[in-house]
Design a protein with these regions (language model features):
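A detector of single, family-specific signature residues
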Residues: 1-263
Length: 263
């Protein structure tokens, strides 16, 4: 195993397929492992570069491999896809990951820390609750409109519900349903506030987040999102690369000497 220079791992939930190659790019070893057996195998390998797609479980695996002395590299799946040379299977995917990682111009994803992943989970749950809150008010608007009652857009239906029920003769079961939706809305609001408080506490412990908060007009949600998704930003060669990665610049589709910028 001393001649292994690069390992590509196709990550799965319970099975992991690896493709190993030497410095010349020649395949020297490939095998399927379970999660415990993979860690056991890599713990006995000399320190080397290990490439994976940036997908579910990849950031945990990157931290684990770094603890074993290896150099983990995460690649966006869209950059791996062009290197699949034949019919798709797990070993072919692992080989394509190796091929992509060996390119000098390849761009890699920075592995997230445990704290970043935990903060990202808070953001995703909060986003889901916000969507549920909007869905709840939309349902209430729709139910009332079916009975000829029009209420201004937004959360006005929540604050005016008692008056609406008093002024209009609605079926009892519908009134009870609307009151349940109102209670659900208030529950969602409390849950969102609780998550935002947790995000603020997490951000107080984050050095990058505190620096971001010093920027005018940057608040808790923006700072925690950037800190979670971007990290310290060392993976970007310049501020222009950061702007392009976050979608703050137009998408380019130029050909034949003609420049075309898309939205």
């Amino acid at each position: 195993m001393e001649n292994i220079a690069l390992i590509g791992i196709d990550l799965g939930k319970n099975s992991f397929h690896i493709h190993c190659q030497d410095r010349r790019g020649k395949a020297v070893y490939r095998k399927k492992f379970t999660r415990p057996k993979l860690i056991e195998f890599l713990a006995t390998c000399p320190a080397t570069t290990i490439a994976m797609e940036a997908c579910g479980g990849s950031h945990f695996m990157a931290r684990k491999l770094e603890g074993l002395g290896h150099s983990p590299k995460l690649i966006s799946p869209q950059f791996v896809r062009p290197f699949v040379k034949s019919n798709k299977n797990d070993f072919v995917d692992a080989e394509a990951i190796c091929e992509a990682a060996s390119r000098p111009s390849m761009r890699f994803v920075q592995p997230r820390t445990e704290s970043q992943q935990a903060m990202r989970a808070l953001h995703r749950v909060r986003e889901s609750l916000v969507q549920d809150k909007v869905k709840t008010t939309n349902q209430m608007h729709a139910f009332l409109l079916e009975f000829g009652i029009s209420v201004p857009r937004g959360a006005a239906v929540i604050s005016r519900l008692s008056t609406i029920l008093e002024d209009n003769s609605l079926p009892l079961y519908l009134s009870q349903l609307l009151l349940k939706l109102q209670q659900h809305y208030h529950y969602l609001v409390e849950q969102i506030k609780d998550l935002e408080s947790q995000l603020k506490r997490k951000l107080d412990e984050d050095e990058v987040g505190q620096r971001l908060l010093s920027i005018p007009c940057v608040g808790t949600l923006t700072a925690s999102t950037i800190s979670t998704e971007i990290g310290d930003g060392k993976q970007y060669a310049s501020s222009r690369d950061f702007a392009a990665a976050t979608g703050l610049v137009p998408r380019q589709y130029s050909t034949g000497g003609r420049t075309t910028l898309l939205g």
